[in-house]
């Protein structure tokens, strides 16, 4: 169905705070990045709509952390969101050039095409917004009195709004609203309601996955390989760090950060596996913020991001090529440190060391080279369902 007067905005800029907090030991992946086969949930949700409707524009919002990464994956336009849903919507509306807009949360991934068709029919000239709703089955009590449950509506998305009215409703940036209908209602605009569906209930807490598991395929078992290499020359009178461990040495490494060549190579390998660029893009040496930065922090930030977008580490294999210092006395401590940062068993981290038999810059004891290789895969959220309460 062609909708050349309607744009689609998919809200995907949230941090999944409630979702991750509801099972913090298990879920470090944001809900919009849960994989369904090969695709993240935000892409599944968007394609569920674009499969049935041809919108003039399709726009997704992404958090500042995810923005560049999502751009590299998305076949649709991606705009950077704000700190709140309202701010993200304001940013997206700047790019809309149609009179109508359909706004949906990617956490409501299973939108009904028949309900949307009903919404389109319900949008007459007097209506600024059409929303789907479901009722409540339980007796409801609020602030000292029982409510008439037949009058209670639980509002869902997607919501169909007139762009001009919605922009006016969101003009005051000091006000925050949880959805489009509440913003338009506060402006005195007329809202129309159509019957929604329990299938469009929002995925908010990790326990909600139980209701979705039969309709969402498990993640692909594909393995992703990443390689990283880094070299640093020695610098006298500087502390030496390798693999997160302080090394007894008369010199350290010449670098903008602390120069931990092991953690730098490992960070690049992780970024390579997930298609996340390189460590120089994340922590540029032109930024004084990272002057003498702790490479353990850098690795932790990169891996936390990798988990947040749906990946987990299977194993890491690290080769340290050095004439000096001697690596053997520190290998065990390095493994423990790296495993702790990456939240994996020590057995998943392997560290090897070799010399160049006196050849090259390493043999001349001018510096150290490290190569790292990692294997990673999608977090299999299906296996965690049994642990949910």
From Swiss-Prot:
A divalent metal cation binds at residues 230, 232, 264. Transmembrane segments: none annotated. This is Bifunctional enzyme IspD/IspF. Its EC number is 2.7.7.60, 4.6.1.12. GO terms for biological process: isopentenyl diphosphate biosynthetic process, methylerythritol 4-phosphate pathway; terpenoid biosynthetic process. It comes from Helicobacter hepaticus (strain ATCC 51449 / 3B1). Bifunctional enzyme that catalyzes the formation of 4-diphosphocytidyl-2-C-methyl-D-erythritol from CTP and 2-C-methyl-D-erythritol 4-phosphate (MEP) (IspD), and catalyzes the conversion of 4-diphosphocytidyl-2-C-methyl-D-erythritol 2-phosphate (CDP-ME2P) to 2-C-methyl-D-erythritol 2,4-cyclodiphosphate (ME-CPP) with a corresponding release of cytidine 5-monophosphate (CMP) (IspF). Residues 224-389 are annotated as: 2-C-methyl-D-erythritol 2,4-cyclodiphosphate synthase. NCBIfam families: ispF, PRK09382.1. It comes from the Bacteria. Pathway: Isoprenoid biosynthesis; isopentenyl diphosphate biosynthesis via DXP pathway; isopentenyl diphosphate from 1-deoxy-D-xylulose 5-phosphate: step 2/6; Isoprenoid biosynthesis; isopentenyl diphosphate biosynthesis via DXP pathway; isopentenyl diphosphate from 1-deoxy-D-xylulose 5-phosphate: step 4/6. One of its GO terms (molecular function) is 2-C-methyl-D-erythritol 2,4-cyclodiphosphate synthase activity.
